[in-house]
Amino acid sequence: VKLNQELVTTLKSQKEIRCFNYDRKKIKTATLAAPIWLHFGAGNIFRGFIATLQNQLLEDGKSDKGIIVVETYDTGIIDLAYKPYDDLNVSVTLKRDGSVNKEIIGSVIESVKSDKEGWQRLIHFFEEDSLQMVTFTITEKGYSVSSYETDFEREPEASESLMGQLTYLCYCRYKKGGKPIAVVSLDNCSQNGKKLQEAVCKFAEEWIKRGKMDAAFKTYLQDPKRVSFPWSMIDKITPQPNKKVQEMLIKAGFEEMPIIKTSKNTWVAPFVNAEEIQYLVIEDSFPNGRPCLEDAGVIFTTREEVERTEKMKVCTCLNPLHTALAIFGCLLDYKTIDEAVGNPLLLQLIEKIGYEEGLPVVTSPAMVNPYHFIKEVIEIRLPNPFILDSPWRIIADTSLKMPIRFGETLKAYKRQGENKIEQLTYIPLVIAGWCRYLLGINDAGKAYEVGPDPRGAILQKALEGLYLGKNENISLKLAPILSDESLFGVNLYEVGLGTKVEHYFAELTADKNVIQKVLDKYLMQ
């Protein structure tokens, strides 16, 4: 049986798959008559997280409007994963214990491509007074202005960049009476609302300067009572479609569950598989109202609290643990993160980094408990066998990640004084492990290709001449790296950690098959 509106009626009696009970036809009529929510970015994080929130409100009778989703970059997603299935999708929640929840999501009322016809639909929606918010999951690159400066010379309605198109759509709303609206980035990048606001304002300034827009439009954009750009923190892993999940759905009676690659290399399917844990924290600044998403688990708070939650996640409770697992996971030749965390030594290592060295200096938000967050990460999220995240994916661009994932913690210890930073063991051990990784030889002595990193070639060049079992001149080779504040937030020698990292590195490079012995030695202290 193919996934479509007709199937929903058939499946309502089945306990294995949860189906919505609301009248979707009625919801569609109400939504198109007076839309409240437009979303840009039709990928998995939207389908597997954002759309499920509104689905819950509809199911609970707390809203009578759905979402209109727009795809501007990879319109094949609409053609292959939305239109053939009446804009429905199966949300599959992958749990740590191996069980799954399957639910049909019906909250997407219309899917729009950025072609000529779609463009006219978007202008119509933006001009509607009822529109409360426009949200985005377009990745951090989507907010770039520098790549599209040629757009400044075009007419606004002919813009080729999403940020230019968004600016023009906001201008259409302004010209139609200037009703308030919230423009909300839900992308996984810090200060995302600021990035979005700066991009829109830059386009507006350039077009105003060239006489293509009214000067007063800038005032409209800069008044938070009329146009707001709330910040947010989002956290949920929604990997590409999993073949095991596909097989499970076919066994459950779905006929067509193809996993297809679009022409722009996006893997799509009529289903989305995702982990069970999810967080969405949003600055509560919505000048035209908003759906009551707090009833679906979204946390609404101040901008300061959003930023504190982001720092907690990125600097202490998730990302540093990910990087530690990725480094030693690559060295020990693990293919997935759940395999890596299944090694008791690596599990202990991330526990020590998180609980013992991270939590004492964590940026602690009021709305999320850092201890509980780490506990979920270590006990539920990282060991999830369905997620299939790879150490080799996470290890990419580590030179850019180190200053945030470990540097902020090191700076916090430095500010405390009393030589507390010198007492750290496990963060310096991870730094030594990263230098060991840069040699391009795993623990068994086999060569591998070091992952992509903008500073990778320079760092590897600095370590030339160091081999397993031949590690003279360690200080000479490591000093330029360990003293580099742009890598670690501090000069590791000046804070009393440089020599310690050198010592750990010497042990990690003493021979083949020593890494687990070194980890065991320091974890047992």
Q: Where are these predicted regions, by residue range?
A:
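Substrate/ligand-engaging "lid" and interaction regions
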Residues: 1-525
